[in-house]
Amino acid sequence: MRNLKMILEYDGTRYKGWQKQKKDVLTIQDKIETVLSKMTGEDIQVIGCGRTDAGVHAENYVANFHTNCDFTVDYMLDYLYEFLPEDIVVKTMKDTSERFHARYNVKSKTYVYRINNNKFRSVFNKKYAYHDNEKLNISAMKDAAEFLIGTHDFKSFTRLKSNSKSTIRAIKYINITENQGIISIEVNGNGFLLNMVRIVAGALLEVGKENIKPIDIEKMLNEKKRADASLILPAKGLCLKDIQY
């Protein structure tokens, strides 16, 4: 049996996230499994590198699946390109080790949250960036981000309904950059809690607006109180950028 590794990108706007759910719920996984099953005549189960929430996008999402088919990789890529909707594209595919598992072999993930800080929202990036035109103190945001680097209990940076067994996570780096008014908050870590990156971005945005101070981020960490909904930025600004194995 073959084990095939795929790298894909998708616009998550109209989907209820990656993971397949009950019937008639639109998800990325369900779309891909449906097309692969039709192509191979098998009941294909796709293993994803992790869950992305409703409305979240991905630039380099990694998945794998097992099949007995003997189609070439080029044939399968062309088939997927033809039959998947325009907002999902499988960019690469290759035969890989039987032991490869897209989820369990992940060492770290990189997400980016984008904020359009220009005066007016953009017609062309409105689905991929959160618009906030209040003047931001980028230097203060960078100072605040330093408190989040390392291994911490991120209980204050997840939703009340999160049922994760452990809220300990390790963030390797947070890079904050600005290009033509688009603020990108890039976060790399060994794993993330429910809505964690969106809450981190929301907290850093509050620092940028000078509603709170950089040191308040450290206080939030130490308080270990689950975040209130006001800190959670909209899903559309979040994108899974890369996966490290």
Swiss-Prot record:
Residues holding substrate: Y111
GO MF entries: RNA binding; tRNA pseudouridine(38-40) synthase activity
InterPro entries: PsdUridine_synth_cat_dom_sf, PsdUridine_synth_TruA, PsdUridine_synth_TruA_a/b_dom, PsdUridine_synth_TruA_C, TruA/RsuA/RluB/E/F_N
EC number: 5.4.99.12
Uppermost EC category: isomerase
CDD domains xref list: PseudoU_synth_EcTruA
Record field: transmembrane: none
Catalysed reaction, written as an equation: uridine(38/39/40) in tRNA = pseudouridine(38/39/40) in tRNA
Domain of life: Bacteria
GO terms for biological process, alphabetical: tRNA pseudouridine synthesis
Quaternary assembly: Homodimer.
HAMAP family, alphabetized: TruA (MF_00171)
Family listed: Belongs to the tRNA pseudouridine synthase TruA family.
Function: Formation of pseudouridine at positions 38, 39 and 40 in the anticodon stem and loop of transfer RNAs.
Name of the featured protein: tRNA pseudouridine synthase A 1
Organism, scientific name: Clostridium tetani (strain Massachusetts / E88)
